[in-house]
Regions:
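Hydrophobic, proline/glycine-rich low-complexity stretches
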Residues: 2-78, 216-254
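Internal, well-folded beta-alpha domain core
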Residues: 36, 92-254
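Short, surface-exposed, charge-dense and proline/glycine-enriched linear segments
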Residues: 6, 12-15, 84-97, 137-141
Length: 254
């Protein structure tokens, strides 16, 4: 990407893979996502349904909901026209939903190690939480430690070593790998009465399978989801560049 306040980013040059056209309005945020780990577990829909507003339809694959935990590190986070970027670790807990003809990510929580980022995101209606986080990398192994420390919140921890395994590939449409990762909008509700929506765009994911040593994971306990004992489906992505559009109340997008 060019330096300074350039309004063009190469990420928007590639759009043929999208399930719907880019928004007509201008994007408002650019960011780079690094060393992402996608962990996913199958969960029966009846356990997810009470956690999502009734107006939002659950998105399932072969009859199953999937709950994901995704730790990563962001850099170059900047609003449009602002040349001073922010870097921070982030860890989200998610499932998948659809409404108004669009399927996307439902965020249960997003933990981040940036006081200002958490405050701005919560003002927008996103369920961000303060966390003490540390990310270290030695060769291809990423050490990720996160402990939620948000005031009046339930403690949630994640401690793991992970890294890539195998060749880089792009998921094929119709496969579970594709369904879990190729998402271009988000939904969330910090307040149960106010669902918010946002569009994002990025190139197709360059995925690898992941090797994971998961030591502690209590990220879903605060929302009442008990993860199965089976090993999660694990994917790794080295880098993704992303642009995002404004977060708006869902009704405003209808």
């Amino acid at each position: 990407m060019s330096s300074g306040c350039s309004l063009r980013v190469p990420v928007t040059d590639q759009t043929s893979h999208r399930p719907w056209p880019l928004p007509k309005s201008r994007w408002v945020m650019f960011m780079r996502w690094h060393d992402l780990l996608f962990l996913h577990w199958p969960i029966r829909p009846e356990y997810i349904r009470p956690l999502i507003p009734a107006a939002i339809e659950l998105d399932t694959f072969d009859g199953w909901c999937w709950v994901g935990i995704v730790p990563f590190h962001m850099s170059g986070v900047r609003p449009r026209y602002v040349p001073l970027p922010l870097s921070l670790p982030e860890l989200n807990v998610r499932t998948y939903v659809k409404t108004a003809g669009k399927s996307g990510v439902w965020f249960f929580s997003l933990d981040a190690a940036s006081w200002i980022a958490v405050r701005v995101a919560r003002w927008l209606g996103l369920p961000y939480y303060d966390a003490r986080m540390k990310v270290e990398s030695v060769a291809d192994i990423i050490r990720y430690d996160s402990v939620r420390k948000h005031k009046n919140s339930v403690r949630a921890e994640f401690h793991a070593d992970y890294g890539p395994a195998g060749v880089v590939y792009r998921a094929t449409p119709g496969t579970l790998d594709y369904w879990l990762t190729e998402r271009y909008c988000l939904f969330a509700a910090l307040n149960p009465d106010r669902v918010v929506f946002g569009e994002i765009h990025h190139p197709p994911w360059a995925l690898q399978h992941a090797e994971v040593k998961l030591e502690v994971n209590t990220m879903t306990q605060s929302i009442g989801i008990e993860l199965p004992e089976q090993r999660p489906l694990a994917h790794f992505a080295r880098l993704q560049e992303v642009v995002a559009w404004p977060i708006v109340p869902l009704a405003a997008n209808a």
